[in-house]
Amino acid sequence: MLYFIPTPIGNLSDVSLHILEVLAKCEVIFCEDTRVTKKFLNLLQTRYSLKLKDVSFYSLHSHNEDEILKNIDLSIFKKICAYMSDAGMPCISDPGNSLVKFAQKNKVEYEVLSGSNALILAAVASGLVEKEFSFLGFLPNKGDERKVAIQNALNLPYPVIIYESPKRILNLIKTISGLDPQRKIFIIKEATKKFETKYFDKAINLAQILENENLNGEFCLVIDKSKNTKFETILESDILDLDIPPKPKSKLLSKITGINQKKIYKNLIK
């Protein structure tokens, strides 16, 4: 049996009784970082008197998951196993997706526990999400790839939720302000933590507000939907026409087509 266990994104009290019950019977824990997970479990033992079995820990993250899953002995899942990312819900801008696919392919019984998730928290707190929305995770870091992603996000006819780092949050808001100054944006910083802060305003105003704010922390944004009934989406042909190197071009094409990036890259450099 395999459990996917969400961990608090800032407030230890968000741990559910169900999570504690599952952890108490776990025999194997796969985790993004064993040091972070062991520290978290120590906190649970102190605060909630959690009693753990003699647990075996295995590091499983984006850099080693292919190798680990290729060589893993399926008999390990006869034990009570769990996967935990460092903070938040596994698979949501965090590792874990490959393990889900592995479980499906190999008929390993699994269950996802409910818990902390900045994406859903921001969606509810924003007041902008009623039904459909798009979650983009973290945008590309720089260059034309980032510009294309931002423009596409602003063109969508439903709210868009984005994670952003403290280093790039102001740049993102200024870029949006330059493209659509009246666009409403909700921002939550350090969700569920002691210094949680919320902002809600037009992009042009937020660009000025954030200039004078302490921007340390983790950010989640909800961008209001496009008010245009006619909107342009960047097509595959538009990306092919961009004067950018093959690598970022292959990333963009992979995102909009779903085709493997390496395959696209090989075709581009032929």
Write out the residue ranges for each language-model feature:
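Glycine-rich, flexible N-terminal cofactor/catalytic loop recognition
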Residues: 1-62
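A contiguous loop/helix-start segment that scaffolds small-molecule binding in enzyme catalytic cores
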Residues: 2, 55-56, 79-80, 159, ...
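Short active-site oxyanion
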Residues: 23-29, 108-110, 159-160
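Alpha-helix capping/helix-boundary segments
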Residues: 35-37, 118, 168
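Conserved helicase motor
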Residues: 58-66, 139-142
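Short amphipathic alpha-helix with an adjacent loop that forms part of the alpha/beta core around
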Residues: 68-77, 152, 207-212
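Class I SAM-dependent methyltransferase SAM-binding "motif I" and its flanking Rossmann-like core
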Residues: 98-156
